[in-house]
Swiss-Prot record:
Compartmental location: Secreted, Cell wall; Membrane
Recorded superkingdom: Eukaryota
Family matches, as InterPro entries: Expan_Lol_pI, Expansin, Expansin/allergen_DPBB_dom, Expansin_CBD, Expansin_CBD_sf, RlpA-like_DPBB, RlpA-like_sf
Transmembrane feature ranges: none
Gene: EXPA19
Expansin-like CBD domain mapped to chain residues: 164-243
GO cellular component terms given for this protein: extracellular region; membrane
Principal place of residence: secreted
Protein name: Expansin-A19
Keywords from the named record: Cell wall, Cell wall biogenesis/degradation, Glycoprotein, Membrane, Secreted, Signal
Lineage per the UniProt record: Eukaryota, Viridiplantae, Streptophyta, Embryophyta, Tracheophyta
Pfam families: DPBB_1, Expansin_C
Residue stretches making up the Expansin-like EG45 domain: 41-154
Role played: May cause loosening and extension of plant cell walls by disrupting non-covalent bonding between cellulose microfibrils and matrix glucans. No enzymatic activity has been found. May be required for rapid internodal elongation in deepwater rice during submergence.
Amino acid sequence: MGNIFLQLLAVVALCIAPARSDWLPGTATFYGGADGSGTMGGACGYGNLYDQGYGINNAALSTPLFNDGASCGQCYLIICDYSKAPDWCKLGKAITVTGTNYCPPNYDLPYGGWCNATRPHFDMSQPAWENIGIYNAGIIPILYQQVKCWRYGGVRFTINGFNYFELVLVTNMAGSGSIASMSVKGSCTGWIQMTRNWGANWQCLAGLAGQALSFNVTSTGGQTIVFDDAVPAGWSFGQTFSTYHQFDY
């Protein structure tokens, strides 16, 4: 049976591109109910995952995977490690999920539980998890790797905050799915470096109300895109603006 699993792993690796060559071991549980509705919101700040382009195939990431929010939006290909749990794995099945939430350690449990500070663990939406695992297992050993994200449409920017505080939520990002650095430019300013506030929310203290806004975004994959005038003058806090540009890596 071990040979069958190795053959399956090779087939999955050949069919997924582009992808990193290394499969990494981890574990996975599920949450959010049979319809996944309990996974909406989360520590990345995406809110309604359907509206933001992520859907039901999502996961809360343990501390080493979440990386203080720097991994928000990244995509992971996951298979159940059949060689370790043949009774609980669905042979030949794989699922790609987006990191949308944080799974914190539970220090009421020994060593902080499954989402302890050192374990690579995915607390997946139940519908996503059931693609690869048998429900009664509860937790399964997995193999995973980060893969390219695919999204419909362009990158979106939601402008939150107040007065001299701009908090920009970046969503629907393809390619590596996550942001390494970001700057903003008003129609009356030069480029202003932004910093991560929390999750996929980036901030600046510039007082840009009333100005058209451009963004310079570099993905964790190393691609930089300048979104010229992504937000028109006269915008209001709480508005979302879609673009025609998208990341490849």
